[in-house]
């Protein structure tokens, strides 16, 4: 059921961080209510990229995406960037009205840049505002009492979103008296 109070969480895995030369290879999405309760999850989608794109990944991406199995899932995938965008957009539309939710996640500006370039319909559907958990992480480092959120950093899109939601819950408890 659609609600303007629902939040759109997206995570991308890419072949690198340069939006002009790198590509999206995985996308996942979760919808939560404003209290961060998960309403629905979209299965992560591995996006096909040709071998020449994968060959241009940096050392970190090659190691990480090979260890998680993502590189092989990308090679085996039949799903284009456009098809993945359409699937995720259809998922979001079930739960969130047009431009009512900020885009939520960790260091979400990086994901937003890739969405704007490669999945502009998702980018446009989200409100221009962003809820970036990284901001609270930094504030906690500066002003917190030393407690920190321990991340697993699996670099799997759906796991990363779940972890971002849990991290925001942690900071809400530790930093915010609202």
Swiss-Prot record:
One Pfam family per UniProt: RNase_T
InterPro entries: Exonuclease_RNaseT/DNA_pol3, Oligoribonuclease, RNaseH-like_sf, RNaseH_sf
GO molecular function: 3'-5'-RNA exonuclease activity; nucleic acid binding
Annotated ranges, domain Exonuclease: 7-168
Enzyme class: hydrolase
Main location: cytoplasm
EC number of the protein: 3.1.15.-
GO CC annotations on file: cytoplasm
Keyword Cytoplasm: yes
Compartment(s) where it occurs, according to its Swiss-Prot or TrEMBL record: Cytoplasm
Active-site residues (renumbered): 128
Any one GO BP annotation for this protein: DNA metabolic process
Presence of the UniProt keyword rRNA processing in the record: no
Keywords, sorted A to Z: Cytoplasm, Exonuclease, Hydrolase, Nuclease
Coiled-coil region(s): none
NCBIfam families reported for this sequence: PRK05359.1
Role: 3'-to-5' exoribonuclease specific for small oligoribonucleotides.
UniProt xrefs under PANTHER family: OLIGORIBONUCLEASE, MITOCHONDRIAL (PTHR11046:SF0)
The family this protein is said to belong to: Belongs to the oligoribonuclease family.
Protein name in UniProt: Oligoribonuclease
């Amino acid at each position: 059921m659609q609600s303007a109070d629902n939040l759109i969480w997206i995570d991308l895995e890419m072949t690198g961080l340069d939006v002009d030369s790198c590509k999206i290879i995985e996308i996942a999405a979760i919808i939560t209510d404003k209290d961060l309760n998960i309403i629905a999850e979209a299965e992560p989608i591995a996006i096909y990229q040709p071998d020449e794109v994968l060959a241009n990944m940096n050392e970190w991406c090659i190691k990480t995406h090979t260890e998680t199995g993502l590189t092989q899932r990308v090679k085996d995938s039949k799903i284009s960037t456009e098809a993945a965008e359409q699937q995720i957009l259809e998922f979001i539309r079930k739960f969130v009205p047009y431009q009512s939710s900020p885009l939520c996640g960790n260091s979400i500006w990086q994901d937003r840049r890739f969405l704007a370039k490669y999945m502009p319909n998702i980018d446009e559907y989200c409100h221009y505002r962003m809820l970036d958990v990284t901001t609270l992480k930094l504030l906690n480092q500066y002003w917190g009492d030393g407690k920190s959120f321990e991340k697993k950093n699996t670099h799997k899109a759906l796991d990363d979103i779940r972890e971002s939601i849990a991290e925001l819950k942690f900071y809400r408890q530790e930093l915010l008296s609202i």
